[in-house]
Design a protein with these regions (language model features):
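Basic, polyanion-binding surface patches
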Residues: 1-178
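Intrinsically disordered, low-complexity terminal tails and linkers in eukaryotic proteins, enriched
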Residues: 200-201
Length: 201
């Protein structure tokens, strides 16, 4: 089977958040869909290894923020390539809390071998801004990002060095490409030790 067939499915790019005690936590997700309009119900797929998964299961609450094409790539790095077990991802961003935090109330879940599919009833929501929503395709083709290993759309060949002329440095964590040899990744904030050289020198 050609695993790239899944790249033809339509996905968005979202920040999914919940509570860890009194602290907000969250991660990037791309597998979210509306199930019904009345009552408004959302389905969300999340890897068992994501810390946010256990927080949603524990609190029964979660929120979804739809990222736009103009979203700062650093937001994806912060929420997609670091774990809420180790850092407070909300420390350096502006955010709004509704209903204490959640806009969705967990109503059911289904387990697979690697992921949980959560069903949530939408309690509240709002549209902020008019920029186009970021799709998974846009993230790969324009932002040039790669999927974290916990993403349902992760493909191992994303870790392979890109071919082409000229030496480039690629962040092994998030896939960001840089033409120099001393750098800190603006997406996932990793240092030069996480970059590997690709192409011809």
């Amino acid at each position: 089977m050609n695993p790239n067939v899944f790249r033809n499915l339509s996905y968005g790019v979202y920040v999914v958040s919940s509570l860890d005690g009194d602290r907000n936590t969250g991660c990037i997700a791309n597998s979210i869909m509306q199930i019904t309009s009345s009552p408004a119900t959302i389905a969300l797929s999340m890897n068992h290894d994501n810390y946010t998964n256990s927080c949603i299961a524990r609190t029964g609450k979660f929120a979804i923020s739809i990222l736009s094409e103009t979203s700062d790539p650093g937001l994806i790095g912060c929420f997609g390539f670091r774990t809420g077990r180790d850092v407070n991802k909300f420390d350096d961003i502006d955010y709004t809390v509704k209903e204490g935090l959640p806009i969705c109330r967990l109503i059911d879940k289904m387990e697979t071998s690697t992921h949980t599919v959560f069903l949530g009833e939408v309690i509240d929501g709002d549209v902020i801004g008019s920029d186009p929503a970021m799709t998974y395709s846009y993230y790969h083709k324009v932002v040039k990002g790669k999927s974290p290993k916990n993403a349902p759309t992760y493909l191992p060949q994303e870790d392979e060095p890109a071919s082409g002329s000229g030496a480039k440095w690629v962040c092994s964590v998030c896939g960001y490409v840089y033409d120099g040899d001393t750098y800190t990744c603006p997406i996932c904030h990793q240092g030069k030790d996480k970059f590997r050289k690709t192409g011809n020198s």
